[in-house]
């Protein structure tokens, strides 16, 4: 790795490194998508190489699968392994009960499928993602291409009847074109400002024709690992009801970090 890490990269680095500590030999592990998850994949590859671990990975996106294979991790499909011991992923927001908004990286559908098919979900993040109430980060909704504008209108009309602060729905763009997911769908980002009842919002969205899935991850996350720029991490375990601090060594010197 060249140069000094920025404070935010240092926070992501230590969160990802600590989360890899949950992985044990012989596990089937789900690999998340996004900038923080990419740090985790690199840490995992380094740990597997140094400790001679035998693990099987399932990726939540094409780009995560490519990174993992480049780093010599064994990547297979969810259909092949059927169920996972652990999934490690990032989040765009999390609240005090560890409910999440995910999908900023465009992989929410596969991320939710993989996380739901896991015994445990570990989320790696930094303190900026902690909120009292979900909704400041736009909520991604994956929609079928056919009739997407009608679907967007239905979404906005439906939001009139739920407890949210805003209703603007914007098609996600990339390089001047609609962003296309790995499944060939579009994403509509909902600028809700505040989600008073996440369960209600998730339920009504997924009942609409044309909606594939939304980025609310409710009762899925077990542990959040919050990285900090001083090299410390905070672990919040929703099942144990515990919160504790640890210090993580920051030494990004392995070959898996050489291109950063």
UniProtKB/Swiss-Prot annotation:
Protein family according to the UniProt entry: Belongs to the ribose 5-phosphate isomerase family.
Source organism of the structure: Dinoroseobacter shibae (strain DSM 16493 / NCIMB 14021 / DFL 12)
GO MF annotation, one: ribose-5-phosphate isomerase activity
Full protein name: Ribose-5-phosphate isomerase A
Regions annotated as coiled coil: none
Active site, renumbered: 111 (proton acceptor)
The protein's annotated pathway: Carbohydrate degradation; pentose phosphate pathway; D-ribose 5-phosphate from D-ribulose 5-phosphate (non-oxidative stage): step 1/1
GO CC terms of this entry: cytosol
Gene Ontology BP term (one): D-ribose metabolic process
The keyword Isomerase is annotated on this UniProt entry: yes
């Amino acid at each position: 790795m060249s140069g000094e890490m920025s404070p935010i990269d240092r926070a992501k680095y230590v969160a990802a490194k600590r989360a890899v500590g949950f992985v044990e030999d012989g596990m089937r592990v789900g690999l998340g998508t996004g900038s923080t998850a990419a740090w985790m994949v690199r840490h995992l590859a380094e740990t597997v190489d140094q400790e001679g671990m035998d693990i099987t990975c399932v990726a939540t996106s094409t780009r995560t699968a490519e990174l993992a294979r480049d780093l010599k991790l064994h990547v297979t499909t969810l259909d092949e392994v059927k169920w996972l011991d652990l999934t490690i992923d990032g989040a765009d927001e999390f609240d005090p009960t560890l409910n999440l908004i995910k999908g900023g990286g465009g992989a929410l559908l596969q991320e939710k499928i993989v996380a739901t098919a896991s015994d445990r979900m570990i989320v790696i993040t930094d303190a900026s993602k902690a909120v009292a109430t979900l909704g400041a980060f736009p909520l991604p909704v994956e929609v079928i291409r056919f009739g997407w504008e009608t679907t967007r209108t239905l979404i906005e009309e439906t939001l009139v009847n739920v407890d949210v602060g805003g209703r603007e729905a914007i098609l996600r763009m990339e390089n001047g074109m609609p962003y296309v997911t790995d499944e060939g769908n579009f994403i509509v980002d909902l600028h809700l400002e505040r989600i008073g009842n996440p369960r209600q919002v998730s339920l009504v969205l997924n009942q609409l024709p044309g909606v594939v899935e939304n980025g609310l991850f409710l009762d899925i996350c077990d542990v959040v690992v919050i990285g900090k720029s001083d090299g410390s991490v905070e672990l919040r375990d929703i099942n144990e009801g515990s919160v504790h601090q640890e210090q993580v060594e920051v030494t990004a010197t392995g070959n898996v970090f050489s291109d950063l």
